[in-house]
């Protein structure tokens, strides 16, 4: 059983970054909206909890609250920004609006020996409009800054800690070490979340679910669908049939490259469908991006259903959905967070879907998908040069985007 950390999301746009930083430590974690039913979160059997930041104030009516099971569990807790305020507020501390909002670089002074932070001055990234004025019983001040009397607090005997700053962003140089101390030393989570363990777990789950039934894989030629197809093929072999849809929007020679790659490198039975007329006909005259995504998603599914009827009984459809696809497609009411966009794998699925979905990458970030694809345990290499080049560009862009995201002006409480 993989040791895990549960991250409760209180509406922060940094929450995915927290999860990525924890997984970079080879510790598995999952993100849950703060109001997720307790049994769903506790089924993860976490070794500890991280409470994200958020745009609310704990003293406002309707602000997200701390679920009772978090403190009742006796497990370690790390509150970040709003998460620290919420833990303090729930335990009898006092949180008030600050005279001035603080956004940007700051220097804290760690004044007390503790398990979380080394002594001395440290650069951090602040983003808050409230501050903690009175500590809850049992807590002490671990760090201060000129404008923040409680930059970090802790109750070591209860293994509860809070920080006003954001350790997850790269502007806090010591943030990775802080998260490592919390996840591995305080929570004692074993760093076992590796590409090989991901593959082993996925293959076991796919075999158990599919049994002797047949599976269609939606192949786009990109990295996500390639890795998803390779994982399922490793699990069930010839029970898998890949379907590549030529929708008329491909790169030059992409169809030929995909056909060659999947036949030669993966040994997957691949069917190529010429659906250019259907896709372009449905997209003709449509300018709204969300409507386009829905049209593309539904047209893909209808195309797969038509191929399944030709092939006989098909029970499952494989998609290369990854974790950001799911999070970014969340509705605007989720944690009061703004919907970014719907992904055609998620928001575009019709309600009368004829297949059960298999999404082996659903809980993986893009960098984890890349690492799985490079593992010797999966027969995906050599990745076709065309896909590898395309992936390299995407990987670099996503890396740049991740750094930019951690710099976005987003004042939390």
Describe the predicted segments one by one:
Residues 1-48, 55-59, 65, 71-73, ...:
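RNA-binding accessory domains that recognize and position tRNA/RNA substrates
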Residues 53-57, 322-325:
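Short glycine-rich anion-binding loops that position phosphate/pyrophosphate groups of nucleotides
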Residues 83, 168, 322-323:
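Catalytic metal-binding/acid-base residues of hydrolase active sites
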């Amino acid at each position: 059983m993989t040791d895990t950390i549960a991250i409760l999301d209180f509406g922060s746009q940094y929450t995915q970054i927290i999860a990525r930083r924890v997984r970079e430590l080879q510790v598995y974690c999952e993100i849950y909206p703060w109001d997720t039913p307790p049994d769903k979160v506790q089924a993860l059997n976490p070794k500890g909890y991280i409470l994200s930041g958020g745009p609310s104030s704990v003293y406002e009516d309707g602000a997200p609250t701390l679920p009772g099971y978090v403190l009742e569990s006796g497990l370690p807790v790390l509150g970040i920004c709003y998460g620290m305020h919420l833990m303090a507020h729930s335990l009898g501390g006092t949180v008030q609006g600050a005279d001035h909002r603080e956004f940007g670089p700051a220097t804290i002074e760690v004044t007390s020996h503790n398990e979380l932070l080394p002594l001395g001055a440290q650069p951090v990234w602040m983003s808050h409009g409230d501050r903690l004025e009175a500590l809850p019983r049992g807590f002490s001040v671990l760090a201060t800054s000129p404008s923040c009397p409680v930059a970090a607090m802790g109750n070591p005997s209860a293994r509860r800690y809070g920080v006003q700053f954001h350790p997850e962003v790269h502007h806090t140089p010591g943030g990775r070490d802080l998260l490592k101390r919390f996840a591995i030393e305080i929570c004692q989570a074993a760093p076992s979340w590796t590409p090989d363990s991901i593959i082993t777990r996925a293959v076991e789950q796919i075999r158990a679910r599919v049994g002797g039934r047949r599976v269609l894989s939606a192949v786009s030629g990109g990295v996500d669908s390639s890795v998803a197809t390779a994982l399922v093929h490793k699990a069930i072999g010839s029970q898998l049939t890949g379907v590549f849809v030529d929708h008329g929007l491909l790169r030059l020679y992409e169809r030929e490259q995909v056909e060659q790659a999947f036949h030669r490198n993966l040994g997957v039975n691949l069917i190529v469908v010429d659906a250019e007329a259907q896709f372009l006909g449905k997209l003709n005259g449509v300018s709204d991006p969300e409507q386009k995504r829905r049209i593309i998603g539904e047209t893909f599914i209808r195309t797969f259903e038509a191929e399944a009827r030709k092939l006989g009984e098909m029970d499952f459809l494989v998609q290369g959905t990854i974790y950001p696809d799911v999070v970014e497609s969340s509705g605007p009411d989720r944690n009061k967070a703004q919907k970014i966009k719907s992904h055609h794998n998620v928001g575009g699925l019709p309600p009368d879907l004829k297949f059960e979905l298999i999404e082996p990458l659903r809980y993986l970030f893009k960098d984890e998908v890349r690492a799985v694809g490079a593992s010797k345990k999966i027969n995906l290499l050599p990745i076709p040069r065309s896909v590898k080049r395309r992936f390299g560009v995407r990987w670099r862009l996503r890396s740049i985007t991740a750094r930019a995201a951690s710099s976005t002006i987003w004042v939390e409480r």
